[in-house]
Amino acid sequence: MESLYRVPFLVLECPNLKLKKPPWVHMPSAMTVYALVVVSYFLITGGIIYDVIVEPPSVGSVTDEHGHQRPVAFLAYRVNGQYIMEGLASSFLFTMGGLGFIILDRSNAPNIPKLNRFLLLFIGFVCVLLSFFMARVFMRMKLPGYLMG
């Protein structure tokens, strides 16, 4: 197999280039990269690709027993479809849970005072638990009867 990889390089020869990095290109800080990762995670879990391709409405509507239109944020009984607000709300919860885990990890640093450590642990646990239980509530709104024991 290695001989097959060698065949193109018998004909091709790498040029002798001396490339330098442009002076205006700087290494981004860790927080800049982290912010880009969190924003991209928010957009991807929110279904931005689905929203661009399918172009769903931001919220839906359902007719009640009196004939009035009532807005709904969740497209019930459809796992493979969503409204834009539904995707953004779910994405916010997923991102909040992920940030909760990161806050819990940051509370482990050795130089944090005891009160700050307690506050970080509390905020981290609240973020993780709130996002978990709200995701379960969203699933019950999306699929009534699901996860009902």
UniProtKB/Swiss-Prot annotation:
Pathway assignment: Protein modification; protein glycosylation
GO terms, biological process: protein glycosylation
Transmembrane segments: 33-53, 84-104, 118-138
InterPro entries: OligosaccharylTrfase_OST3/OST6, OSTC
Coiled coil spans: none
Subcellular location: Endoplasmic reticulum; Membrane
Extracellular side of membrane: 54-83, 139-149
Family listed: Belongs to the OSTC family.
Job description of the protein: Subunit of STT3A-containing oligosaccharyl transferase (OST-A) complex that catalyzes the initial transfer of a defined glycan (Glc(3)Man(9)GlcNAc(2) in eukaryotes) from the lipid carrier dolichol-pyrophosphate to an asparagine residue within an Asn-X-Ser/Thr consensus motif in nascent polypeptide chains, the first step in protein N-glycosylation. N-glycosylation occurs cotranslationally and the complex associates with the Sec61 complex at the channel-forming translocon complex that mediates protein translocation across the endoplasmic reticulum (ER).
Protein name (record): Oligosaccharyltransferase complex subunit OSTC
Source species: Bos taurus
